[in-house]
Amino acid sequence: MVEASNTKGTQKDGILATLEWQEDVAVVTIRRPQRRNAVNHATLMLLQEFQEEARGRARVLVLTGEGEGFCAGADLTGVEDEEFGSALSATLLGFTLLPCITLAAVHGYALGAGTQLAVACDLRVATPSSVFGIPAAKLGLAVDQWTIERVARECGGAIARNMLLGTSTYSGEQLHTQGAVHKLGVLSDALEWAHYLATLAPITIAAHKRGLEAVAEKIVNDAAFEALRAQAWASADAHEGRTAFLEKRKARFTGN
């Protein structure tokens, strides 16, 4: 595994999160283990900053948490702040809008905002014993419509209803059986997969990702998708992919 070449974090309120680079894989780690990686407004703003750094440079972004869990939810000392809700929504949407693959590496608790962050990512690797759930109804809170639609789409309607209405939790193994977790494993497994994914054609990935989001948004003939699709077909990577196939060798994609 390639060593991190660069690390960036913040000292405000202690280190809240870091961004490490392993070649063209960005590894974003929430670092509030004393709060079980519960996110506050400052953490969310930092995640948004990292999203922008990853845009145009990363082929894969891996999101994980330090210590014993992925993210135990929102830091309840500030969740009532209207700015927090706006920051959370922007952060979740930000992961879906990145052109690169986003991959959540989940262990321990992924509750509330933790589950929201996980389902906002394109792919999920989780340990069998990791715990997913949205216990908002136990707190008298309500998640936004985007989250409800995303959880229903990624986890299935029945599981979404049980999470949101019954406040039930699911293990990583249970969600893997249902297809909501794509692979069972630990962070090293997620990073190994990420480095493989980073070898795929980035323009194609961006087009397919936009197309998947357009399907989710029920957009037909989405102009942004069609533009990316045309770019993929006309790209040097497309020529390289076809040439490598004919020459029976591994393609070397440059993102051009």
Write out the residue ranges for each language-model feature.
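Conserved CoA-thioester-binding segment of acyl-CoA-metabolizing enzymes
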Residues: M1-E66
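C-terminal long alpha-helix characteristic of the crotonase
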Residues: P33, V125-S130, Q178-A223, A234-A236, ...
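Glycine- (often His-adjacent) and acidic-residue-rich active-site loop
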Residues: M45, R57, T64-L97, A110, ...
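Short helix- or helix-capping micro-motifs
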Residues: G73-A74, V151, I159-S168
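Glycine-rich phosphate-binding loop at the start of an alpha helix
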Residues: G85, S89, G112, A142-Q145, ...
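Glycine-rich beta-to-alpha active-site loop
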Residues: G94-G140, T169
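Well-ordered beta-strand positions
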Residues: L123, N162, G166-S168, Q174, ...
